[in-house]
Amino acid sequence: KLLMEVEDLEENREYCRHGLEHLLDVARISYIMILEDGADISKDIIYAASLFHDIGRGKSYQSGGNHDEASADIAKKLLPDCGYNDKEIIQICDAIKLHSGRLDIGEFQNKREENKELELADYLKISDQLSRNCFNCKVSNTCKWSEEEKNSNIQI
């Protein structure tokens, strides 16, 4: 219901949308990078954070406020029914709260290559960006993202 609400509210949105395809793209990209980096973050934690990270956008669109906080609040209420314990819920909700904003993609890749320890929120944030195909977007030239923030090619 919450996801359908976001999709309905974004039906005529010109820029990036936040539907199921986006949420799954973020989860898959995060999971691949975490596997590549050998980070100690479980698949179900990654997917939970990814699937909930934009779920509060409907509330944000309708009443204002920060979608990160709204998404974390929704996750906090629903995750216990999904079998997550308090520690996991805190980890997931903290990552959701910190996922907004954009990173310089090149700088992030340098951190990965230098084996710097990254948190779930770091992976969620960069995956949120990398899930966007800016290189194939018809409105990329009017997007508010800087060129360093845009996903300008297919990452391999």
Language-model segments: what does each one mean?
Residues 1-156:
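Metal-dependent phosphohydrolase cores
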